[in-house]
Amino acid sequence: MADFVSTSPFGPVLTAMVTPFNADGGVDYGVAEKLADHLITHGSDGLVVCGTTGESPTLSWEEEHELFRVVKQTVGDRGSVIAGTGSNCTREAMEATQIAAKLGVDGSLQVVPYYNKPPQEGLLAHFQAIANCAPELPLMLYNIPGRTGQSLAPETVYRLAEVENIVAIKEATGSLEQASLIRAHTPDDFAIYAGDDVLTLPLLAVGGAGVVSVASHLVGDRLQAMVQHFAQGATAQALEIHLQLIPLFKILFCATNPIPVKTALGLQGWPVGSFRPPLCALSPGHTEQLRDVLRDLALLP
């Protein structure tokens, strides 16, 4: 675990891990184990498994449960494993969270219910029910309205932060104002994570705990160094790393996540495979732009 004193039990740099597929389109659990080990030994304090970056919408529950098991077995006590067990069906989310807890994960990522767009009182009841069904498992809320069609209002977060095992939120609204409001109205030990790599350093400045990162697949050590510099008051050094990595942060979202980062891993030689439909390959033009950025940052073999 890093030296940074985080307000979260998960650590400051969490990687939203991709899901490797083999040539037949099945989950490649062997590569998942190797990738998890690599990430933990290269700057990541923990891994978020089966989140957006892990292509969770096209994984079966059985595949997700096996990923939780093998990744936690690989990581052991070297880092945290947070299982993506959210759903737009409260009952399904509760069942998946209970199974993940039995598999020994360290926490659960709970996305705002998508498509059915429940009102704030419905969101409150949804997350309270999930927390109550697995009271020993720390939960991280996940607010990403660009994908779900509904945002978790700051006032709802204030109320949810009072629940003992709701310990964090991944804020992917892109709004520092929203993050600041949450920081001002929740307990000090309620952790706020950036959901966008480019906002990691700004969020730390308004009381954030860290990042759930995509770029850490490639630059985990540099992100960890940035966080440590900030924590030690070396803000100029933290800013230098942040500015150096801006081109990478941008190119990794030139297309729908996780298409660019999985392509980048492939360019590095990682056999992570392709994507499950309806996701598709990165365009040739964007692939060349990605290759250029990786080369500039000395990230290619």
From Swiss-Prot:
Its EC number is 4.3.3.7. InterPro entries: Aldolase_TIM, DapA, DapA-like, Schiff_base-form_aldolases_AS, Schiff_base-form_aldolases_CS. One of its GO terms (biological process) is diaminopimelate biosynthetic process. The record marks 52, 115 as: Part of a proton relay during catalysis. One of its GO terms (cellular component) is cytosol. PANTHER family: 4-HYDROXY-2-OXOGLUTARATE ALDOLASE, MITOCHONDRIAL, DIHYDRODIPICOLINATE SYNTHASE. This is 4-hydroxy-tetrahydrodipicolinate synthase. It comes from Synechocystis sp. (strain ATCC 27184 / PCC 6803 / Kazusa).
